[in-house]
A protein has these predicted regions:
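Active-site-proximal segment of zinc-dependent metalloprotease catalytic domains
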Residues: 1-79
Length: 180
């Protein structure tokens, strides 16, 4: 899909929903019976990943971040056509173009944060403005050096992604915005 051998989607979503008619569900996780690496997460729709690849577990968690909480990829490609411009703030909660950081993790940044925040061992567990995210290497920033939305080796979601997940769960549980 989208000219990527590892990006999985389904062209039969309507058929899938018809098959599930009458069954109560909140979120779909589709497992493909293959050992080929890949996955995809469509916000508010489904997670799809391969079930027999050795990296299955971290990939399904990453794709769930997309499909459940609308989290963006936190990695970039040099050859990628820019999707995000400095004039527009991305709607995903874990990336920014610095257009309007106040609505995201701006209140969690240390005073005098460097832009971009250097990727160093000293900053490993610090919230900052690290360049690279939304499939772009430039002009898009993420909050943490490493996160489940960046690599398969990260053990957990970063604090900003965790907050986005908690806010969404709280919204559904309390039928309103989450308290901070």
């Amino acid at each position: 899909t989208f000219y990527s051998e590892r990006y999985l989607t389904t062209l039969r979503l309507r058929q899938l929903h018809n098959l599930l008619a009458g069954i109560a569900y909140e979120h779909l996780i589709i497992l493909a019976n293959t050992d080929t690496y890949g996955g995809g997460g469509i916000y508010n729709s489904y997670t799809l990943t391969t079930a027999r690849h050795p990296m299955f577990s971290p990939v399904v968690v990453h794709e769930f971040g997309h499909s459940f909480a609308a989290l963006a990829d936190e990695y970039g490609y040099d050859e990628y056509t820019p999707e995000y411009t400095p004039e527009t703030e991305p709607w995903e909660q874990n990336i920014t173009t610095l257009k309007d950081l106040s609505v995201k993790w701006g209140n969690q940044l240390p005073a005098n944060v460097k832009i971009p925040t250097p990727v160093t061992s000293k900053n490993k567990k610090k919230i900052g403005l690290y360049e690279g995210g939304g499939n772009q290497t430039k002009n898009v920033y993420r909050a943490y050096q490493d996160c489940r939305m960046r690599t398969n080796t990260a053990q957990e979601f970063c604090p900003v992604c965790q907050r986005a997940l908690k806010r969404l769960i709280q919204f559904y549980v309390t039928e309103g915005p989450a308290a901070e």
